């Protein structure tokens, strides 16, 4: 692991909202007296009924209960739109950049208000009200944000299903939350290719009870010819012509659910993560402001999809609650060329950029040329999210993309946490490439060993969180017992993140990967992220994923999937070279037993590597790979199976 330290530059410190002394003071206050701390910061949003109770939380076995600001009432859409109209009605709220570089729009707060009210009225006319669930299955178009905020305006609960999910996955999620109304588009556009969204919705509904879904609202994106079921389906533009652009916002309790978002469970059955209104918005807006050092007038771009929690918290809710200008991108980093990200940054003068390590690594594989063709002079803060970023990719991001003048915030958090938990702050934190550094305000990480004993000082172990924070999920939809079992039964009175971590002598946290991504080689536990980082540090390697597989002698062997940089070819010589490289870097125990050169790795559209699939292939067991429709490129799996290194026959 890299222990290089990058000091806070004077330019970052001078304009930062928080310096090191302020961080330490605020952090100490947040953990010693959370009631007072969050009472103050809870007022960063507007309340129609002010709260008098701040924190009412318990992680006790059999009695897990999380409530924040519970006697207050508010409305998320009111906070994200209406309260800005007087002072910044004509400011751009959303910059939309289409898949095609010639398509973009600027949507002001006034326009956003009108569009959201219109969408809310369309929903209301179809019987949607407080507490009803609405499934959204949309591309990255402005209507996705309008639909989220329209549900929030009415007190309805949105459940977004990412546009890459199959009809089966969509059906199980519609059924899981009992949505009577689905909002979709005729087709999506992604990297120049069309995605048959409406056709997938039709397929999904066929798999459900006939009386479940009453209405399907279809946004015209491509104008493609799609089947419309009379009486059930309606084009959004036609329905919107029948309503006004004024709609009152429903004041809801702080603990009223805002959204359900399904995330993969270890059993393969997705869990409906429930986030509520008040605490979630306080936490999303506060982390957005301080982590990205957001100043009025900044242009902020998070490259995620709204189908993932990052898109919920850091494209829509956090930025808009702060009156920010947030960029929403329909496309992919490599279309029409692999300069696209950097061209968008120059086109819209982006100041803050938040993306995933997997995107950074894949662009890094194409060399510096595509980056250097652009200026990127507007950039000030670069963020990373989704998985641990290896030091080499961190360094490339810092040096090449940011010209060694932008602060990097390597953020660690989860769907379940609602917002960022461990992160540097641009004006406060010395940086170590590969480390998520220190906890955000109110977050108390603890390291425990396998027996649940709390570890002190520099150590490696299981990452847990002691005590609650306002953005924390409240339950698994319809299954509170599963919530308790999954997150609170492993270690008593602690929230177990499922991640392993290392804490160094400076109190910095290094996330080592999911605990189920730990390989046990001859009795030695090893985080896959460490071996992956070592492989990616080799000059010929663009990306690597490491999994365990059954080994006659060691119990588990190390199987590495390696994607090489453009222009490099895989060979037995290179295999040997990589084994020697890792052996030298980490030690003989970490030497890969099998290396498979792969043109690509199976990733979800949000960029997460599907390790479950890689493990199955490494185990020579690919008869039960499960649903691969969520992958960005399902064909990658066929290549991996075809060229696997561990054939039993």
Swiss-Prot record:
<feature type="modified residue" description="N6-acetyllysine">
    <location>
        <position position="608"/>
    </location>
</feature>
<dbReference type="InterPro" id="IPR000873">
    <property type="entry name" value="AMP-dep_synth/lig_dom"/>
</dbReference>
<dbReference type="InterPro" id="IPR042099">
    <property type="entry name" value="ANL_N_sf"/>
</dbReference>
<keyword id="KW-0436">Ligase</keyword>
<feature type="binding site">
    <location>
        <position position="583"/>
    </location>
    <ligand>
        <name>CoA</name>
    </ligand>
</feature>
<dbReference type="InterPro" id="IPR020845">
    <property type="entry name" value="AMP-binding_CS"/>
</dbReference>
<feature type="binding site">
    <location>
        <begin position="410"/>
        <end position="415"/>
    </location>
    <ligand>
        <name>ATP</name>
    </ligand>
</feature>
<dbReference type="GO" id="GO:0003987">
    <property type="term" value="F:acetate-CoA ligase activity"/>
</dbReference>
<feature type="binding site">
    <location>
        <position position="525"/>
    </location>
    <ligand>
        <name>ATP</name>
    </ligand>
</feature>
<feature type="binding site">
    <location>
        <position position="541"/>
    </location>
    <ligand>
        <name>Mg(2+)</name>
    </ligand>
</feature>
<feature type="binding site">
    <location>
        <position position="499"/>
    </location>
    <ligand>
        <name>ATP</name>
    </ligand>
</feature>
<feature type="binding site">
    <location>
        <position position="522"/>
    </location>
    <ligand>
        <name>CoA</name>
    </ligand>
</feature>
<keyword id="KW-0067">ATP-binding</keyword>
<feature type="binding site">
    <location>
        <begin position="386"/>
        <end position="388"/>
    </location>
    <ligand>
        <name>ATP</name>
    </ligand>
</feature>
<feature type="binding site">
    <location>
        <position position="310"/>
    </location>
    <ligand>
        <name>CoA</name>
    </ligand>
</feature>
<dbReference type="Pfam" id="PF00501">
    <property type="entry name" value="AMP-binding"/>
</dbReference>
<dbReference type="GO" id="GO:0005524">
    <property type="term" value="F:ATP binding"/>
</dbReference>
<keyword id="KW-0547">Nucleotide-binding</keyword>
<dbReference type="GO" id="GO:0016208">
    <property type="term" value="F:AMP binding"/>
</dbReference>
<dbReference type="InterPro" id="IPR032387">
    <property type="entry name" value="ACAS_N"/>
</dbReference>
<dbReference type="GO" id="GO:0019427">
    <property type="term" value="P:acetyl-CoA biosynthetic process from acetate"/>
</dbReference>
<dbReference type="InterPro" id="IPR045851">
    <property type="entry name" value="AMP-bd_C_sf"/>
</dbReference>
<keyword id="KW-0460">Magnesium</keyword>
<dbReference type="InterPro" id="IPR025110">
    <property type="entry name" value="AMP-bd_C"/>
</dbReference>
<comment type="similarity">
    <text>Belongs to the ATP-dependent AMP-binding enzyme family.</text>
</comment>
<feature type="binding site">
    <location>
        <begin position="190"/>
        <end position="193"/>
    </location>
    <ligand>
        <name>CoA</name>
    </ligand>
</feature>
<dbReference type="GO" id="GO:0046872">
    <property type="term" value="F:metal ion binding"/>
</dbReference>
<dbReference type="GO" id="GO:0005829">
    <property type="term" value="C:cytosol"/>
</dbReference>
<feature type="binding site">
    <location>
        <position position="536"/>
    </location>
    <ligand>
        <name>Mg(2+)</name>
    </ligand>
</feature>
<feature type="binding site">
    <location>
        <position position="514"/>
    </location>
    <ligand>
        <name>ATP</name>
    </ligand>
</feature>
<keyword id="KW-0479">Metal-binding</keyword>
<dbReference type="Pfam" id="PF13193">
    <property type="entry name" value="AMP-binding_C"/>
</dbReference>
<keyword id="KW-0007">Acetylation</keyword>
<comment type="function">
    <text>Catalyzes the conversion of acetate into acetyl-CoA (AcCoA), an essential intermediate at the junction of anabolic and catabolic pathways. AcsA undergoes a two-step reaction. In the first half reaction, AcsA combines acetate with ATP to form acetyl-adenylate (AcAMP) intermediate. In the second half reaction, it can then transfer the acetyl group from AcAMP to the sulfhydryl group of CoA, forming the product AcCoA.</text>
</comment>
<dbReference type="InterPro" id="IPR011904">
    <property type="entry name" value="Ac_CoA_lig"/>
</dbReference>
<dbReference type="Pfam" id="PF16177">
    <property type="entry name" value="ACAS_N"/>
</dbReference>
<protein>
    <recommendedName>
        <fullName>Acetyl-coenzyme A synthetase</fullName>
        <ecNumber>6.2.1.1</ecNumber>
    </recommendedName>
</protein>
<feature type="binding site">
    <location>
        <position position="538"/>
    </location>
    <ligand>
        <name>Mg(2+)</name>
    </ligand>
</feature>
């Amino acid at each position: 692991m890299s222990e290089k330290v990058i000091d806070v530059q004077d330019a970052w410190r001078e304009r930062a909202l928080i310096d090191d002394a302020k961080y330490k003071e605020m952090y100490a206050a947040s953990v010693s007296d959370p009631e007072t701390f969050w009472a103050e910061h809870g007022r960063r949003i507007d309340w129609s009924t002010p709260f008098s109770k701040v924190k009412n939380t318990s992680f006790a076995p059999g009695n897990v209960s999380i409530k924040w600001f519970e006697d207050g009432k508010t409305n998320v859409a009111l906070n994200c739109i209406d309260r800005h109209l007087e002072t910044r009605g004509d400011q751009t709220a959303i910059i939309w950049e289409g898949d095609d570089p010639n398509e973009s729009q600027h949507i002001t707060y006034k326009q956003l208000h009108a569009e959201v009210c219109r969408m809310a009225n369309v929903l209301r006319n179809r019987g949607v009200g407080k507490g009803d669930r609405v499934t959204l299955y949309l591309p990255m178009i402005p209507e996705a944000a309008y639909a989220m905020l329209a549900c929030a305006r009415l007190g309805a609960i949105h459940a977004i299903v990412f546009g890459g999910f199959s009809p089966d996955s969509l059906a199980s999620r519609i059924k899981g939350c009992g949505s009577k109304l689905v909002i979709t588009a005729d087709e999506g556009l992604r990297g120049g290719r069309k995605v048959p969204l409406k056709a997938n919705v039709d397929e999904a509904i066929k798999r459900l009870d006939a009386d479940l879904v009453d209405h399907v609202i279809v946004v015209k994106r491509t104008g493609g010819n799609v089947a419309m079921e009379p009486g059930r389906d309606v084009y959004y533009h036609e329905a919107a012509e029948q309503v006004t652009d004024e709609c009152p916002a429903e004041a809801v309790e702080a603990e009223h659910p805002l959204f359900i978002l399904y995330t993969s469970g270890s059993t393969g059955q997705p869990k409906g993560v429930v986030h509520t209104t008040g605490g979630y918005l306080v936490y999303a807006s506060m982390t957005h402001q301080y982590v990205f050092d957001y100043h009025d007038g900044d242009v902020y771009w998070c490259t995620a999809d709204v189908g993932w929690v990052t898109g919920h918290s850091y494209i829509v809710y956090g930025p808009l609650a702060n009156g920010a200008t947030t960029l929403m991108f329909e496309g992919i980093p490599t279309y029409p060329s692999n300069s696209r990200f950097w061209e968008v940054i120059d086109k819209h003068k982006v100041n803050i950029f938040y993306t995933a390590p997997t995107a950074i690594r894949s662009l890094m594989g194409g060399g510096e040329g595509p980056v250097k063709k652009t200026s990127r002079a507007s950039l000030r803060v670069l963020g990373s999210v989704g998985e641990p970023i290896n030091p080499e990719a961190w360094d490339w991001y810092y040096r090449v993309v940011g010209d060694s003048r932008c602060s990097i915030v390597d953020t660690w958090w989860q769907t379940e946490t609602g917002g960022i938990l461990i992160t540097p702050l641009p004006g406060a934190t010395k940086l170590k490439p590969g480390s998520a550094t220190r906890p955000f305000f109110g977050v108390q990480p603890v390291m425990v060993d396998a027996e649940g004993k709390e570890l002190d000082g520099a150590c490696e172990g299981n990452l847990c969180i002691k005590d609650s924070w306002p953005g924390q999920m409240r339950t698994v939809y319809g299954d509170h017992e599963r919530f308790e079992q999954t997150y609170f039964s492993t270690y008593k009175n602690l929230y177990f993140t499922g991640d392993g971590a290392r804490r160094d002598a400076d109190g910095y946290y290094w996330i080592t990967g999911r605990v189920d991504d730990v390989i046990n080689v001859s009795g030695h536990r090893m985080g896959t992220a460490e071996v992956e980082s070592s492989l990616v540090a080799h000059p010929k390697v663009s990306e690597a994923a490491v999994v365990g597989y059954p080994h006659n002698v060691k119990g588990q062997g190390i199987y590495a999937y390696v994607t090489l940089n453009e222009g490099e070819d895989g060979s037995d010589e290179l295999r040997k070279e990589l084994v020697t490289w890792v052996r030298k870097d980490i030690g003989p125990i970490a030497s890969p037993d099998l290396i498979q050169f792969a043109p690509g790795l199976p990733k979800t559209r949000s960029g997460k590597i599907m390790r479950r699939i890689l493990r199955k292939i490494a185990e020579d067991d690919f008869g039960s790979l499960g649903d691969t429709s969520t992958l960005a490129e399902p064909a990658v799996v066929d290549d991996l199976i075809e060229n696997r290194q561990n054939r039993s026959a």
